[in-house]
Amino acid sequence: MPSVNVRDMDSFEAALKMFKKQCEREGILSEIKKREHYEKPSVKRKKKVLAARKKLAKKMKMLSR
C-alpha cells in the first residue's frame, strides 16, 4: 500500500504526483485492470501460452538478425 509523507513545503499537486508514482511502481493500476473481470483458469492458461509463444518468436527474430 503506497503512502506519501507530506512535508510542510509540499503542495497538494506534488504529494499527488508522488502518490501516483508509487502506485505505478507497485503496479496497482495494472493489478486492478487485471482483476476487473473474472478470468477462467483455462483462459489464463491460453493467454500464458500465447505470451510465451510470442516471447519466443521475438527472441528467435532477434537472434536471426
UniProtKB/Swiss-Prot annotation:
GO terms for cellular component: ribonucleoprotein complex; ribosome. It comes from the Bacteria. One of its GO terms (biological process) is translation. InterPro entries: Ribosomal_bS21 (IPR001911), Ribosomal_bS21_sf (IPR038380). Keywords: Ribonucleoprotein, Ribosomal protein. Pfam families: Ribosomal_S21 (PF01165). One of its GO terms (molecular function) is structural constituent of ribosome. Belongs to the bacterial ribosomal protein bS21 family. This is Small ribosomal subunit protein bS21. The gene is rpsU.
